[in-house]
């Protein structure tokens, strides 16, 4: 937040709504929109700011969405409220951090029936570190098991906030919304900065319009911008002419001028997607700022998977889709990749498994492309016997065991908050996932916080679902990355008739390699069609075969035309068939159907 200068307007307030997943952020945003009457009742629908079908179907927010409303307070003043509805899932915490960077205040939403959860704490610290004014909001007070007094104690004891200013609401029923709006006007600081200073505005998001090019979302900290201005993006040093500026009111609303404190958008005929970088600073060409604003901390992907088009002819379409998604999702990384089995595609980096699933669904829905994703993995560190250490993300990059001194894998610090009655269940799950308990804190008589150190690879697939299952849905989970630690990792290769299938190779923990290999071999046996020769499916670590399945050959009745007669005639035909099968086995390539690859990938998810 820019300090110094005078308040631009006492009637402008910028804030975001942050909370643990499913605590009611989008529902509260809906009530604000209805209160401001910026959309007719006929056009209104729930989750108004969740524009993607996948968000509505899953009931989650994936993209932060900004909107501007006007509110008349009890003192008669009109306030322009710019607010951002943010995601709650840990995979999209980068979206939350960008929203926080463009605000002066935050509404910390807490479910009255569940209390403070892991992501509540994580988002609180993020807002606290950015020096935001935090207003605690207790939601869902209409629920039969709501306990407002207990949650107020948590706000005081766990977060150190003043529980007296906490606002109790029911976003679903519209209870307490007026009190909350009054608190926003009272407690959230007005933005600071002078409109006389050179323009400095922070790009916090963007999306692509097929007709007008890139639509840039930005927050102005100093100066002003108007139609026809020539701007410079300070990071890429590219210059553009402003064609349209405006604010977000569900749809885009044009304005002639925007000034310090405003959150809005601009369109400048930018067709080259690479010209726009999230975190870049916008300034004017004829009155430039001397230095850019502090951008966003570059986020690093933690989960890696390769994406391939089912139809190889759609590679160029997939490239365009990835470029468009990257514009709208700065946390997505990708580079070109190829596989002998799956063709040309892209090696992608994601923030988590939900992020991966969302990107896959967006590719298929928004761009009408069918794609295959390889088994997700993390980034491992290789220390060779000779030379410097390096990182790998795919099994193909894994060198032979004879060349490796040691392997390191990324570890996380897992924070799990759970009712005390489910403590034993959670500890059992963490133990199975190679977790090491580092702390156990009783938050009160009913809740305990468990802190574990565990490998990132162990939480990729089913960890979140398992802790939810064994706690009847009450456990909450958040994590942060730690450093790398030594591990006993091996590359599991799958061989079909002695030939390694690159697309099926996996990096696995040595103790679980045999179980994994047996499962894959059985899956392939069910999926690969029988041939006229025997097919051997093997799981191997280096030259050691640890699992095997055999597909028996189809037997063609070559003696069918022999009606009676000499038995030696039949024997000759059978011997000839036997020799033919030997030759066929030597030169025959086994065709592995796409369904087999999908079956193996699906088994990894389970």
From Swiss-Prot:
GO BP terms in the entry = positive regulation of translation
Primary location = membrane
Q: What is its EC number?
A: 3.6.5.n1
Disulfide bridge positions per record: none
Per the record, what are the reactions this protein catalyses? Answer: GTP + H2O = GDP + phosphate + H(+)
The domain of life is Bacteria
- One example GO MF annotation: ribosome binding
Q: Which Pfam families match?
A: EFG_C, EFG_III, GTP_EFTU, GTP_EFTU_D2, LepA_C
Q: Which residues bind GTP?
A: 22-27, 139-142
Stated role:
Required for accurate and efficient protein synthesis under certain stress conditions. May act as a fidelity factor of the translation reaction, by catalyzing a one-codon backward translocation of tRNAs on improperly translocated ribosomes. Back-translocation proceeds from a post-translocation (POST) complex to a pre-translocation (PRE) complex, thus giving elongation factor G a second chance to translocate the tRNAs correctly. Binds to ribosomes in a GTP-dependent manner.
Tell me its family. Answer: Belongs to the TRAFAC class translation factor GTPase superfamily. Classic translation factor GTPase family. LepA subfamily.
Protein name (Swiss-Prot/TrEMBL): Elongation factor 4
